[in-house]
Amino acid sequence: MQTDFISYADSQMEYEGYAAFDGAVTTRRPGVLVFHAWAGQDDFARVQAEKLAALGYVGFAVDMYGKGQRGNSAQENNALMQPFMNDRAMLLARAKCALNTLQHHPQVDRHRIGAIGFCFGGLCAMDVARAGLEGVRAAVSFHGLLGAPVGVPGGAKPLHTKILALHGWNDPMAKPADVVAWANELTAAGCDWTLEAFGHRGHAFTNPQAAEAANGMQFCELANRRAYAAMEDFLHETLQEKLSGAPSAKMGACPTPA
């Protein structure tokens, strides 16, 4: 496996992403953005990129905050994240910058892109999907925030990016009413969306460091394993098919209701 830190920039600042891929493969392959949680790009996000590389993708751990900008406490993490919660247009612009970087990677098929994210990163992946960006076929949210952006134009309807939300039903940051609102939003957009909800699970169930059950944040090995299996199947279905357009009937496709 080959791994590289990749510097990229926009008009605001410089960022440092992390790419992982099988260097022995010479053909272009799908790329998957990995959006980090509220602390910034860390070992957890980079490991996810490496796991994706082992599955045959180019994994790219995104840097949403800027090179070297990381949080070391809940207060610092929130200070880094909150500006993006207040300005979802800025969030999408940063995500687009990372997407452009991945799509220009020499190992990547720019027309077969996925996005996954954890917590805050789940929201980032969801906003990329909502925008209907060219080449982005799939988005997966792990215990992500679900609220729709305000004042940010969505993609053309029907939304072409398929979405999978892996959600702890007891997540205090995405309550049942939020889930219903999210489902209604995506249904109205004509999106092919899937929700897999894990009963008795809360926030951060994929993070081995999460151990605050009283606050609704607790790692769960079983839910983690099931969620990753669902992600693998979803990405294989959406990214490994080289032909563009609607999936064929033999793949079990169903028409999206008008």
Task: Outline where the language-model segments fall.
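N-terminal cap/leader regions of alpha/beta-hydrolase-fold enzymes
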Residues: 1-258
